[in-house]
Amino acid sequence: MPTLKLIGLGLSAKFVTREAIDEISKCNVVLFESYTSLSCDINLDFIKFLNKNVIIVDRKFIENNIKEIIKLLKEKEDVCIVTIGDPMIATTHVSLIVEVKDKGYNFKVIPGISVHCYIISKSMLSSYKFGKSVTITYPYNNKIDTTPYDVIYDNFIRGLHTILYLDLKEDKIMTAKEAVELLIEMEKIKKQGLVSDDRIIIVGQRLGCDDEEVVALRLKEVFNYKFKEPPHIIVFPTDKLHFMEVEALKCLMK
């Protein structure tokens, strides 16, 4: 029976599993998502090396063309949706699987290493102390979305760390410096004392690549620090730290 396969490639080519390679190679139609994340060496050419029948798709295609995907399955073709990282981080994929299963078709999930799990490991903070994650987005119509501040604050007062994803647009990628600038502006609006000069954050840069870097910095140090090229990701730790977490942060400080 035709099968919908959700395949994660991990953060870079060295993390691509044998199972992922095998499934992509034998798939009838490969849809490569270009909007979920960036990789230093996974691109269209990489996917085409495994399978020539590749179509680059964006978020709108997956959300708005479920019927087209069902049609491909009806034509007795396996369909592979390939993503950088892990495929099931996106809720769109969950709804797609539910729809496909409801139509009587099979599905298969091939996990990949996600930036979520990766930065938790690299931060060396206690994995069970991470709360809800949130994305810092660019202002829209000159208005800043302060939702990230609210999420960080709620986690912070409960002794939980926050992972901050940074906005990814077709024409630009948010940097750690831009994200901190927005957090400072949010502080001016919210005035809860959360974002201050001496607050420590962890910044992951080009995770999974050979030149990756993970560093702990005080906010006042961010603007003079020479970061690597994006993608970046930020961890905003709580101040309710176990003594071993304190020592771990010291290991990441320059």
Swiss-Prot record:
One of its GO terms (molecular function) is diphthine synthase activity. S-adenosyl-L-methionine binds at L11, D86, I89, S114, V115, L166, L207, H232. It holds the Pfam family TP_methylase. Keywords: Methyltransferase, S-adenosyl-L-methionine, Transferase. Pathway: Protein modification; peptidyl-diphthamide biosynthesis. Gene3D superfamilies: Cobalt-precorrin-4 Transmethylase, Domain 1 (3.40.1010.10), Methyltransferase, Cobalt-precorrin-4 Transmethylase, Domain 2 (3.30.950.10). Its EC number is 2.1.1.98. It catalyses: 2-[(3S)-amino-3-carboxypropyl]-L-histidyl-[translation elongation factor 2] + 3 S-adenosyl-L-methionine = diphthine-[translation elongation factor 2] + 3 S-adenosyl-L-homocysteine + 3 H(+). InterPro entries: 4pyrrol_Mease, 4pyrrol_Methylase_sf, 4pyrrole_Mease_sub1, 4pyrrole_Mease_sub2, Dphthn_synthase. Belongs to the diphthine synthase family. S-adenosyl-L-methionine-dependent methyltransferase that catalyzes the trimethylation of the amino group of the modified target histidine residue in translation elongation factor 2 (EF-2), to form an intermediate called diphthine. The three successive methylation reactions represent the second step of diphthamide biosynthesis. Homodimer. This is Diphthine synthase. It comes from Sulfurisphaera tokodaii (strain DSM 16993 / JCM 10545 / NBRC 100140 / 7). The lineage of its organism: Archaea, Thermoproteota, Thermoprotei, Sulfolobales, Sulfolobaceae.
